[in-house]
């Protein structure tokens, strides 16, 4: 059985992330969205809320589960019995970092392969950072995130 781990901070989860998960759910038996605590990134939403939002966005996919974690990704992959890391590449600028990360993960978890997917064209420009920035300034984010995420951001930045 192929069990893929899709790690990230997901602060917040976007339609781009959701697109990757939907496509992965057709390619793999099981998809685990691994929401990283990432305290050094000082996330906008607490881990529990990011996990809940990811669950809401993916609840229609029966072979997808969402789990929060705060350990080394290689260790978490072993705990989850994952055999693939899934990463998204929006642009060439993402590749160098992701390539370095994949090589490090290969050293730490040699039995887990790294697989890169590019986003659908309509989502290739979306990033959590840009979504947060637009929301902070009161812009319309509904084209970029699930309604539950838009609601959470609206509540967070009420003026």
Curated annotation (Swiss-Prot):
Cofactors (names): Mg(2+)
Residues annotated to bind ATP: 9-10, 17, 88-90, 98, 123-129
GO molecular function, one term: ATP binding
Location in the cell: Cytoplasm
EC number: 2.7.7.3
Keyword Transferase attached: yes
Chief localisation class: cytoplasm
Leading EC class: transferase
Catalytic activities: (R)-4'-phosphopantetheine + ATP + H(+) = 3'-dephospho-CoA + diphosphate
UniProt keywords, alphabetically: ATP-binding, Coenzyme A biosynthesis, Cytoplasm, Magnesium, Nucleotide-binding, Nucleotidyltransferase, Transferase
Record site feature (Transition state stabilizer), residues: 17
Gene3D superfamilies tied to this protein: HUPs
Cited InterPro entries: Cyt_trans-like, PPAT, Rossmann-like_a/b/a_fold
Metabolic or biological pathway, per its Swiss-Prot or TrEMBL entry: Cofactor biosynthesis; coenzyme A biosynthesis; CoA from (R)-pantothenate: step 4/5
Gene Ontology CC annotations of this record: cytoplasm
Binding-site list for substrate: 9, 41, 73, 87
GO biological process: coenzyme A biosynthetic process
Function statement: Reversibly transfers an adenylyl group from ATP to 4'-phosphopantetheine, yielding dephospho-CoA (dPCoA) and pyrophosphate.
Quaternary structure note: Homohexamer.
Family: Belongs to the bacterial CoaD family.
Identification of the protein by name: Phosphopantetheine adenylyltransferase
Protein species of origin: Pseudomonas syringae pv. tomato (strain ATCC BAA-871 / DC3000)
Upper taxonomic lineage: Bacteria, Pseudomonadati, Pseudomonadota, Gammaproteobacteria, Pseudomonadales
